[in-house]
Swiss-Prot record:
Species, as recorded: Prochlorococcus marinus (strain NATL2A)
Matches recorded under InterPro entries: UppP
EC number(s) reported in the record: 3.6.1.27
Family: Belongs to the UppP family.
Keyword Chloroplast (UniProt): no
Name of protein: Undecaprenyl-diphosphatase
Stretches that traverse the bilayer: 10-30, 48-68, 96-116, 128-148, 203-223, 229-249, 259-279
Keyword Repeat: no
């Protein structure tokens, strides 16, 4: 096999593998960005960069929309059919449309500001392994505290605007590698007293705009500079991410029906310590 073909097939293999990693870790509170940084390092692969990582998140975004398609359809229909300007939102689904919008504002605004005023952010020390390790440990401790002090008695109908504003601000912290978007939003929701499975579903739903927009922006930027043959591995990564995301969403929701999140606390502590002591 010619060397160029062999190299290209290996790039496609890496895209499939990293797509699986992305999809599986995007919805668990363990940070997909951190794993997409650490795993290539362990295998001696080149860091594929922020654009690749953000682009393959599109597979995860499509997976959320597909998995929750019935709920999302209900949310949209409720918003446009039951909203009365004089009375406000009548039911939880129409309010949830507003909540998703509100929770998305901080991360989109801060993300845009970073894009405009910190062009070298992707090469900063914040994306280094040491920063990721420390962040992983800190986020593990916060998740543990949310399990200890969160009352976990709120369902969707009980969620209010204050809960969502706090969750949206927390989600903006996910711009820093190692934080975990699903992890920090789940932690915020638990601190607000939201029941675990409801907290996870809310975390997934509010992530749709941010993950989708981020992925589309980076993918379009790659389309402008890469050839079709170079784009194919990214598309493969997106598809791989989609299927592993579906599996991860279903697995995590079933897990939270009967368990707490402490196993992820232990994992993140071990992950952070492993990076500090090994890499």
């Amino acid at each position: 096999m010619p060397e160029d073909i062999s190299r290209y097939l290996f790039i496609c293999f890496k895209s499939i593998f990293l797509g699986i990693i992305q999809g599986f870790t995007e919805f668990l509170p363990i940070s997909s960005t951190a794993h997409l940084k650490v795993v290539p390092y362990l295998f001696g692969w080149n860091d594929l960069g922020v654009s690749f990582s953000a682009s393959i998140q599109l597979g995860s975004a499509v997976a959320i929309i597909y998995y929750f398609r019935n709920h999302i359809s209900l949310i949209i229909n409720s918003f446009f059919s039951s909203f009365n300007p004089s009375k406000g939102f009548k039911d939880e689904n129409s309010r949830l449309f507003l909540y998703i919008f509100v929770a998305s504002i901080p991360i989109l605004v801060f993300g845009l500001l970073i894009k405009l005023y910190w062009p070298n952010y992707s090469d900063s020390n914040l994306r280094g392994l040491f920063s990721i390790a420390i962040t992983s440990i800190v986020m593990a401790l916060l998740l543990a505290l949310s399990e200890i002090y969160g009352k976990r008695n709120k369902l969707f109908v009980d969620i209010n605007l204050n809960d969502v504003i706090k969750l949206g601000l927390a989600q903006s912290l996910a711009l820093f590698p190692g934080v975990s978007r699903s992890g920090i939003t789940l932690t915020s929701a638990l601190f607000s007293g939201i029941e675990r499975k409801t907290a996870a579903r809310l975390s997934f739903l509010v992530g749709i705009p941010a993950v989708s927009i981020s992925g589309l922006v980076e993918l379009f930027s790659l389309f402008r500079v890469l050839s079709v043959i170079d784009i194919i591995p990214i598309i493969i990564g997106i598809i791989s991410s989609f299927f592993s995301s579906i599996f991860a969403i279903d697995l995590f929701l079933k897990f939270l029906s009967k368990n707490n999140t402490l196993v992820f606390v232990y994992y993140r502590l071990a992950f952070g310590i492993f990076i500090l002591t090994t890499l």
